[in-house]
Amino acid sequence: MNEVYVFTSESVSEGHPDKIADQISDAILDAILAQDPKARVACEVLVKTGMVLVGGEITTKAWVDVEDITRHVIKDIGYNSSQMGFDWESCAVLSAIGKQSPDIAQGVDNQQTKILGAGDQGLMFGYASRETDVFMPAPIAYAHRLMEKLAKARKSGQLPWLRPDAKCQLTLKYEQGMPVEVDTVVFSTQHSPDIEHKDLVEAIREEIIKSVLPAEWLNDKTRYFINPTGRFVIGGPLGDCGLTGRKIIVDTYGGMARHGGGCFSGKDPSKVDRSAAYAARHVAKNIVAAGLADKCELQISYAIGVAEPTSIFVDTFGTGRLKNSEIIDLIHTHFDLTPQGIIDQHDLLRPIYRQTATYGHYGRESFPWERLDKVAELSKAL
């Protein structure tokens, strides 16, 4: 691709209402898996001023204190005062949790074949490219890093007037398919009422943005919109209702790749919405790292109760060194994409999910689906 273009992605902070919900959902999932790895969990959360509602379907032998887990997540994020409209000590925590439908369970846990079927029908996408060292699209990768830097500045006291809710949007200019310049940075952060707008703008630009983005990408043409409304005191659940699963593009590739529609947080790995999306990322990343293509998007689909994928699709956007059909043959040879195969390969029946609920599910080496363990075998095909 030789044309010049711009592309935009956004990220949100751990104090964003939707991300509060995601973190609570995954913290509850982790607590259950720590006691009962075979549990079936679909945990949904709603947060609003002074209230958290936890719902969903959970079938488990474990007992966890949902209220205590919820309060500790909110405390860790930093909502510790009723002046913010949300306080971990005084908020109400309501529960509306049921069990998994036996009709679903009989398809997932096939007692005759002992084969784990997919938890639902659905389609999942995985993506990787060479534009960053973590094989992620640059706009979403750097947007996440901006939000991480902001959280560190808030929690360390470096910028004591920061509050938990924030979001940023990053537009990068591309030439020949690679990022070369920052076109626009949009940055909105909740703050205490006693900080002057001009002081906030300077601090965010100098101490957050310029410390994260490559200096060679910034110039006098770069546009900055920092708290462009001028005031962001009311935020978090006081400002907006938050729900689990409403930041699926933030969680994945920032819009650079397609999305099957299913969210991740609060779901145990029998749900292919989550586990197969992780597997698809693993496949795509290894394909790119092995040199089979510079970009790779993979689609997998499943039928409920059926173990093998119903389809696999690959697009390398004209960058492939092999035919797409040949890459699909390699996928069938080197990757087990049944639900049980995915769970076993990535050791997914562990309490590892809360850390995924902020700053994206991809691009961090601590996640098992980010391993480059198939590169040697795949590269033999070249």
From Swiss-Prot:
According to the UniProt entry, the coiled-coil residues are none
User: Under which pathway is this protein filed?
Assistant: Amino-acid biosynthesis; S-adenosyl-L-methionine biosynthesis; S-adenosyl-L-methionine from L-methionine: step 1/1
* Binding annotation for Mg(2+): 18
Give me the residues that bind ATP, please: 16, 165-167, 231-232, 240, 246-247, 267
The cellular location(s) given in this protein's UniProt record come to: Cytoplasm
Q: How is the cofactor bound?
A: Binds 2 divalent ions per subunit. Binds 1 potassium ion per subunit.
- Molecular function GO terms recorded: ATP binding; magnesium ion binding; methionine adenosyltransferase activity
- Where on this chain does L-methionine bind? 57, 100, 240, 271
Which GO terms are recorded in the biological process aspect for this UniProt protein? one-carbon metabolic process; S-adenosylmethionine biosynthetic process
Which keywords fit this entry according to its UniProt record? ATP-binding, Cytoplasm, Magnesium, Metal-binding, Nucleotide-binding, One-carbon metabolism, Potassium, Transferase
Question: What ranges does the record give for the region Flexible loop, renumbered to this chain?
Answer: 100-110
In terms of PANTHER family, this protein maps to:
S-ADENOSYLMETHIONINE SYNTHETASE
UniProt function note: Catalyzes the formation of S-adenosylmethionine (AdoMet) from methionine and ATP. The overall synthetic reaction is composed of two sequential steps, AdoMet formation and the subsequent tripolyphosphate hydrolysis which occurs prior to release of AdoMet from the enzyme.
Task: Identify its protein family.
Answer: Belongs to the AdoMet synthase family.
What is this protein identified as? Answer: S-adenosylmethionine synthase
